Every structure is written in structure tokens, then in C-alpha cells.
Amino acid sequence: MTIHHEPDSIVLHHPSECNGCPNRDHCSESMFSVKESRYVVDIEMRANVTEHRILCAKGCPKHEKYIVGSFPENVSAHVQYGDSVSTLANILSTFGAVSDSRISTIMRNLFDITISPGTIVSMVSRCANKVRDRLGAIKNEIISSEVTHFDETGIRINGKTLWVHNSSTNKYTYLTVSDKRGRIGMDENGILPKFKGIAIHDCWSSYWKYDLLHGLCNAHILRELKGIVDNRPEHQWPKLLCELLHDMKSAKDDAVGNDYDTVPLNILDSFDNRFHCIMEIAERECPPPPDPQVRRRGRRKVGKERALIERISANWVSMKRFVHDMRVPFDNNQAERDIRNVKIKVKVSGCFRSLQGAKNYLDITSYLSTAKKHGINAVKALNALLSGQSNIIFSDPSE
């Protein structure tokens, strides 16, 4: 562990022989030298109360009248909570995924501060209102990016299932909520309708409705292939395709490590040849079912294995895009990481009580996630936000 600042206090430990020595008072400190130092890092669990007083003056020699001072703009009530309390409450609510009632309990137990869950909701709401000035800039940065990751997950709001839509890059995160998982919810998120780059996703059908270049999450496909290997061990095609995807990833990693602009053409051709051979095996091992005697409306049921074969065959160009374009990743882990905290929040705290509460949480999480990607920790980012300096999240801390 590293000590990041000078010690706040120093405790000296004299030799045990000095304790009770009749000559101790005659020994000067210059007789002693430091043999070894050890450090104990601790925190103080207490509230800090600052009293603000405005003063008045009678008979000022300059103004010759009664003059009165004024309180700072941020000191507006007789008793109020400071920015540090609001910062901690918001961090616990977002990154900590703690419910409002538990935040109230934590504050009372740690600092002997009694804050009602309603007050915590108000703190989060005020913070979210300040964050929204920055969300437009975050959104525009993602729209103008070359590669963006997309994902969605369900949450419960007041007993109803709604959907969180995530759009993110390695520098920016933008989260919104909608009652629709598909095209309507994606349009409400506002990124995909204006996006012109490469969209990375898990092959959910609604993403294909946008006229874009697409890249698929091959880690997701590998998980599906493994499921087939476990359930149908006699089939060879899923094993062969897993090996092919791993070989493609290794080739991409080697190309990046050698600063190549692309994977060599002969290697790319060999990947295509292997893929087509594997698909021929897949057709033999799991052929399409015969046409039903009675045709019914809707999509024909073909089983999970056959559905995966058809999906992979139709989207091979998007699957292999990561070896043709060095900007495209092998998987969609970026989006999954950025949306993971939402899943943790739901698991730990349960459902949101209101749609506005969910929006507040997602707006603050978008801001804090973006700040983290720029090397700025959550405490510094929220303190900057509350003091009107939220542009700090777009700065480079190394400069």
C-alpha cells in the first residue's frame, strides 16, 4: 500500500527503558533518532459542522451607517447539509447501488447524521438536474464516434418492466430508460438514429433496422456455441467454430501487437474457407426441419441450434469485421461493463419506485462513468458538479 500524503499526526515511541527512568526529564529529543517508521491509515467517522455568522457594524467611519454582511449563496437555510454529504449520498446511490433507506441508515450509523430517505431522494434529484447540462455534450461525442457499443437490460419500475438502453465508447457513457426494448426505445435513446459509425451489439434484431455497419459480440456467440457443445457433444460444427473464432482473435491480437493495419490477406482468406467448411458440416449435422403440412402465421420454429446456424450464416460479415477493421473489438464487453452497475443496482436495491427516480440514477451514472473513463474519480467529479465545474469530466488529467 502506498501513502499518498504526509501524515496528519506523528506518535513517538521511546525505548521501553525510558519509561519511568528518573533521568527522562533531563534527556533532550536531539538524543533520539528515528529507527523505523510505520503508518496506520484510518478515517474519522464524524460530521463537521460549520457555523456561518453575518456581522453588522454601526457607525462605520467610511459609510457612516448601519451595514450588514451576507451569507454565501450556497448557505440558504438555517440548518442544511453540505456538498460532501450530498456527494456521499449520490455515490452510494449510483456506484454503490445502495437503496435510499439504507443510505439513511449508513449516514446515521457512521456520522450520527439523521437524513430521511426523502431528503436523499431530493439530493439525488438536485444532482441529476445539474448533470443534465453535460449529457448533451456526452451524447454528441458518442454520435460522432467511429465505433460505439450498444446494449440493453430490463429493470423494474413501480412493478412494471422497463428497459435501460446503453450507448457507450471507451470515453463516454449514455444511459436512458424506455418502456420499449426495440426500435422505439433505441430511437428514444437518441444515438442510433443519428449515428454513422460502426455499431457493436449482441445481434438483437432491432439493431439491424438501422442502416449502419455492424459488428457482433463474438463472446456472446461463443457462449451460445458452448451451450450447444454441452448439450449436443456429438456435433462437431460448434467445436470447430469456437476454434475458428479463437484463432481469429489471436490473429487480430498479433496484428495489433505488430502495428499492422490489418490481418494479412492470406490469413483472412483461410478464415473464410474454414468458416464455409464448418457451415457445410453444420448443415449436415443440423439440417432445417421439413416444411410443416399446415402453414401457420409467424416465424417457423426451428430449435435453438438451427436458429444459431441460420443467424451465424446470415451475419458472418459482421462477425468477422473485427479482423478486417482494427478499430472493431472482438466482443461487446465495453457496453456490458457500462450497463453492469444498473443490474447490480436492481439486484441490491430492488425496483425503482418511480420513472423519474430511474432517470435521475441513469443520468448521474452516465456522468460518473464518463468521468471515470477520463481518469477522474467519482468524489472529484461530483464535487466539481456541485460547484458548477462539471466540464472537468472532459479534461485530460495528464495535462
Regions found by a protein language model. Give the residues of each.
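Catalytic center-proximal scaffold of phosphoryl-transfer enzymes
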Residues: 1, 57-59, 64-399
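Short, flexible loop/hinge motifs at secondary-structure junctions
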Residues: 1-76, 121, 150
